[in-house]
């Protein structure tokens, strides 16, 4: 089993920016990329992500969940052990979350060889608006960012989940990642990229957007009875049209463009902070 350092500090004040980390290679060439996802080691989106990554770097590492981990957000496993199974050269499945995958890859399985970039995806379905709070795809990228690795979450929108246009992400993904790397982004930021549900030739330009409200209207619980007479419950999202803010991610995606939104772990609401500051002491 490949092993490495057991500890790596979170990114903080004085850490190099993502652009500086990436540009350390002459000619902006990446040496190694770490891949993960939330749909699991056998997901078609992970195969697409591998296609994208192999056009960007010679050394690709895959550390992905053994089973589907959709909706686990930034969770990491603190109360049960993580099992690792080797599935090929630099390819591992673990009994954990996308966040666990990022930690296991960067801090252990890669043997101390830091990745130049972490890519998480390609998710089956868009990750937009407030649903990014639940997204394991975004959570995996956010964890990579907190470990000091430039990180991008990638998702492919669909109308019919059984007719996902994976070729769109596969065809356009390498160019999108190269364009973003050439620009660079902040040290405490990860990027959330969504591809529209269109053939590659019909897709618009890469567009910067803000995180909108999205389509999430609420949650619901669906209940049934199994063959043994025991009840079971499924938690599901309830979606529908909602008014979006200016420059929203969902409006840009529905217009047929590839959307990128920079996301941070700092969730402080500045407007509410200033309101509360009028009555409460500050640290």
Positions of predicted regions on the chain:
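N-terminal amphipathic/basic-hydrophobic helices that include classical n-h-c signal peptides
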Residues: 1-26
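Glycine/threonine-rich flexible loop motifs
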Residues: 126-135
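Short beta-strand segments
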Residues: 36, 63-65, 95, 120-123, ...
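A cross-family phosphate/adenosyl-ligand binding-site feature
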Residues: 24-33, 47-114
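Glycine-rich phosphate/pyrophosphate-binding loops
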Residues: 145-168
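Short acidic, Gly/Ser-rich segments with clustered Asp/Glu that frequently serve as metal-coordination loops
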Residues: 39-47
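Electrostatically charged, flexible surface regions
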Residues: 101, 166-283
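Alpha-helix C-terminal capping segments
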Residues: 105-112, 139-150
């Amino acid at each position: 089993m490949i092993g490495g350092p057991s500890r790596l500090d979170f990114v903080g004040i004085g850490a190099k920016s993502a652009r500086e980390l990436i540009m350390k290679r002459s000619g902006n060439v990446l040496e190694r990329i770490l891949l993960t996802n939330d749909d699991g080691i056998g997901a078609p989106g992970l195969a697409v992500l591998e296609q994208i990554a192999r056009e960007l770097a010679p050394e690709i590492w895959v550390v992905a969940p053994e089973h589907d981990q959709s909706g686990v957000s930034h969770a990491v496993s603190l109360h049960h052990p993580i099992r690792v199974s080797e599935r090929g050269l630099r390819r591992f499945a673990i009994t954990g979350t996308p966040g666990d995958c990022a930690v296991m890859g960067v801090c252990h399985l890669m043997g101390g060889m830091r990745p130049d970039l972490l890519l998480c995806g390609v998710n089956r379905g868009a990750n937009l608006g407030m649903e990014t709070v639940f997204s394991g795809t975004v959570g995996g990228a956010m964890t990579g960012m907190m470990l000091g690795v430039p990180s991008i979450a990638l998702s492919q929108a669909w109308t019919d989940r059984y007719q996902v246009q994976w070729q769109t992400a596969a065809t356009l993904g390498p160019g999108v990642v190269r364009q973003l790397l050439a620009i660079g982004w902040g040290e405490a930021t990860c990027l959330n990229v969504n591809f529209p549900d269109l053939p590659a030739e019909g897709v618009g330009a890469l567009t910067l957007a803000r995180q909108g409200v999205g389509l999430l209207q609420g949650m619901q619980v669906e209940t049934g009875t199994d063959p043994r007479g025991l009840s079971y419950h499924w938690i599901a999202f309830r979606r529908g049209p909602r008014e979006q803010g200016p420059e929203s991610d969902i409006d840009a995606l529905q217009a047929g463009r590839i959307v990128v939104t920079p996301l941070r772990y700092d969730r402080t609401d500045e407007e509410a902070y200033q309101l509360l500051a009028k009555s409460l002491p500050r640290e």
